Amino acid sequence: MGKFEFDDDKSKANLKKHGIDFSEAQALWNDPRLLEIQAKSEDEPRFLVIGCIGSRHWSAVVTYRNGAIRLISVRRSRKREVEIYEG
């Protein structure tokens, strides 16, 4: 697992909207089955990461900057994302 970085205000907003902050979301990288899929992006390369924390599936959008994992957003996984993860 690499070094993480994120915007503190965005992390607080994510907690309010989705029930998880970016510090908690780092536990996704403890999932040995963690999936990473390249996401559509017009500026920097972004990736959709799908994994479990406990018994819940979560999806995160991340990018990589200077060797760090930058968290952009985290939410509960959609049905199709769970199917991809479980498949």
Map each language-model feature to its residues.
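Ribonuclease/tRNase effector modules and their secretory precursors
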Residues: 1-87
